[in-house]
Design a protein with these regions (language model features):
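Bacterial N-terminal signal peptides that target proteins for export
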Residues: 1-8
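Rhodanese-like catalytic fold shared by cysteine-dependent sulfurtransferases
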Residues: 4, 15-42, 68-110, 114-170, ...
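Hydrophobic helical h-region of N-terminal Sec-dependent signal peptides
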Residues: 9-13
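N-terminal secretory signal peptides
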Residues: 37-59, 65-66
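Structural scaffold elements adjacent to functional motifs in cytosolic proteins
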Residues: 58-60, 171-173
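Beta->alpha turn/N-cap motifs
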Residues: 62-63, 251
Length: 264
């Protein structure tokens, strides 16, 4: 299966929680609860709080391309970057040191590709060994983040890669209808921000589900939302997540930035 469905994720999460002896409760407050780990986990609710009050540096421990395609908003990446000579790149730990200017007491939260992903665990251990004193993990990772209603962000390099390699992706242009008619991105579909209302199954989102602009037969289709600016795109992306679309990202840039990213 190309995309991880919300049902599969929640079933997996419930099975893992049972395996590790956790009782049922508020799923947003749950953690994987593994034993033998030297770094604490944070729940989805706690991570949302961290991002809201910027009380920790959130690091995506995945390779750069995965980060560029889809990451939790506000997270940064410390993997090797194309074009950086090996003499200038030592390790993820060294990149963390550069990012934090050597301040090893800085609160850090790591995440990667879900419960079975070992990258955040390995990086956490390496950071502890390097003297970092406040390292935690969102071990549920980006699949559960999405399943619990979290939107993600896509970078220009990620947009370029997806456009070239995933022909099932739906681009959603949320600018004004007249702006869309005057020119948009290849195969984009128009859902103007002005028609996206609060609530579920209302306004232009409902109409888009009925008329085929949104892929109602497959809620796991990748949706990339592009607007006049980031705020406009994020608003609509969050509305689509509330409609049970499971793979929604908004573009981190303006419409002109998206055009530039997709320019041949």
């Amino acid at each position: 299966m190309k995309h991880l469905t919300a049902l599969w994720t929640v079933v997996l999460f419930g099975s893992l929680a049972a395996a590790y002896g956790q009782t049922a409760g508020n799923i947003y407050q749950a953690t994987l609860g593994e034993s033998g780990q030297r770094t604490a986990e944070v729940s989805t609710e706690q991570l949302r709080g961290v991002l809201a009050d910027m009380s920790a540096v959130v690091l995506d421990a995945r390779p750069l391309r995965e980060y560029a395609i889809s990451h939790i908003p506000g997270a940064m990446n410390v993997a090797a970057k194309p074009g950086v000579p090996m003499s200038a790149y030592v390790s993820d730990v060294a990149e963390v040191g550069r990012l934090l200017e050597g301040k090893k007491q800085t609160p850090i939260v790591l995440y990667c590709n879900g419960p079975y992903c070992g990258k955040s665990k390995r990086l956490a251990e390496e950071l502890l060994a390097a003297g970092y004193t406040n390292v935690r993990r969102y071990q549920l990772g980006i699949p559960v983040w999405r399943a619990l209603g979290g939107v993600t962000e896509i970078e220009p390099d990620g947009l370029r890669y997806v456009a070239a390699n995933d022909q099932t992706t739906v681009l959603v242009d949320v600018r004004k209808a007249e702006d869309f008619r005057s020119g948009s991105l290849p195969n984009a579909r128009s859902i103007p921000r002005s028609g996206v209302l609060e609530g579920k199954d209302v306004g232009d989102v409902k109409r888009a589900k009925d008329d085929g602009r949104l892929p109602i037969q497959d809620h796991n289709t990748r949706l990339i939302v592009i607007g006049r600016d980031v705020a406009e795109a994020r608003y609509v992306a969050e509305a689509l997540v509330r409609e049970a679309f499971q793979n929604v990202a908004y573009f981190h840039g303006s419409f002109q930035d998206a055009q530039a990213a997709l320019k041949p």
